[in-house]
A protein has these predicted regions:
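Catalytic domains of cell-wall/extracellular-matrix polysaccharide-remodeling enzymes
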Residues: 64-65, 85-211, 215
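Active-site beta->alpha N-cap acidic-glycine motif
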Residues: 2-91, 97, 110-111, 211
Length: 215
């Protein structure tokens, strides 16, 4: 399912599925499962060539292991978000444990953006996350904010080894239009497909006058 079904959107209306149109044609690239010290810098290099900004949904344990790579993402001017601490599947995780995983990750990441791994989250988890006061929970004393839970408009399926880089490229360009949130992965599993498809996606939309912004 490259694009989420209408039923899924109806069931989770509070998730961010697509960005509103702003008058400038825009694609919102996102990358899940990093940071990775060998892969993420290559993604950043490609984005830099196209003056593209993106959003990286980072796993807390990876941030803990690779803090230099995490800091590099921020220095390059990209947005960051949490992707739990150990990539927990919400449908298979108790609500309290899921929330604790988010809290552990965001103690390192400090962001108001969160994407559920696999896109799987229980309504009880969603409700509890939405009620968190991040100022109190994470000592972000300068301001107070509510968590934004981000889904996607199009998922590239770059991690699927049954697909070729061409398949991944076509998945994106056939389905992503103005305001689309596109999900890639800066992970070992997705590397071969992602690293081949991403520059082509950037080139395709650049030629059509799109810009690439972070969330």
């Amino acid at each position: 399912m490259i694009k989420p079904s209408k039923i899924f959107r109806i069931f989770y209306p509070s998730l961010l599925w697509q960005m509103p149109k702003t008058g400038k044609k825009c694609i919102y690239l996102t990358f899940d499962d990093g940071p990775h010290p060998l892969i993420t810098p290559k993604v950043l290099e490609i984005l830099r060539k196209y003056n593209a900004k993106a959003t990286f949904f980072c796993i807390g344990n990876n941030v803990n292991k690779y803090p230099e790579t995490f800091e590099l993402i921020k220095r390059e001017g990209h947005s960051i978000g949490s992707h739990t601490f150990n990539h927990e599947n919400g449908w298979k995780t108790k609500t309290d444990d899921y929330v604790k995983s988010f809290q552990a990750s965001n103690e390192l990441i400090h962001s108001d953006l969160f994407r559920p791994p696999h896109g799987k989250i229980k309504r009880s988890q969603l409700k509890k996350l939405k009620t968190l006061n991040l100022k109190n929970d994470f000592q972000l004393s300068t301001f107070n904010f509510q968590l934004k839970i981000v889904a996607w408009t199009v998922i590239a399926y770059d991690w699927d080894h049954a697909l070729s880089p061409e398949d991944v490229y076509q998945n994106v360009i056939r389905n992503a239009n103005d305001g689309a949130i596109v999900a890639f992965h800066d992970s070992i599993k997705a590397y071969n497909n992602m690293i081949s498809a991403l520059p082509r996606v950037l080139e395709y939309y650049s030629q059509k006058g799109f810009i690439f912004k972070s969330l």
